[in-house]
């Protein structure tokens, strides 16, 4: 996984990063996006939950209350809102500028002592590692519970048919 890499990781997000796209970005240390970027975890609208770490990483990054709201509602988040809540570090006008910003940050990090950078990353990440591991195991268990429900099938069917799903709690 990205977060297990010894070196810092930087994501550049341009456009929609919904569901797994947001979850992938959450795995990185630093996130830079364009002004047109959109984030969100819409899985509950399909009668499933974020299953790639979103329920564990998002609350750690932006706080439990806001994370619950975003996961429960499936609301989309604009780039500026993502910046204000701490979901991203920088918002740039376009992809080229976002990429330049990411490279600038990477170069700045590259000028620092590599052993110190690795140690700092390990110390920061290690502060919650055991809790994160348990949380990810719990998320996977809950994801498996919803994976084979009739509601999930209805959610996927409704999505494909571009209509609102009708759930029955089964």
Please annotate each region the language model reported:
Residues 76:
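Short aromatic/basic micro-patch
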Residues 32-37, 79, 88-137, 141-150, ...:
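C-terminal long alpha-helix characteristic of the crotonase
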Residues 1-4, 12, 18-72, 85, ...:
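CoA-thioester-processing core
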Residues 155-170:
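Short, basic/aromatic-enriched C-terminal tail that caps enzymatic domains
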Residues 54-57, 66, 116-119, 139-142, ...:
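Hydrophobic alpha-helical segments typical of transmembrane helices
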Residues 70-71, 120-123, 159:
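Short alpha-helical scaffolding segments that buttress acidic/His motifs in well-ordered protein cores
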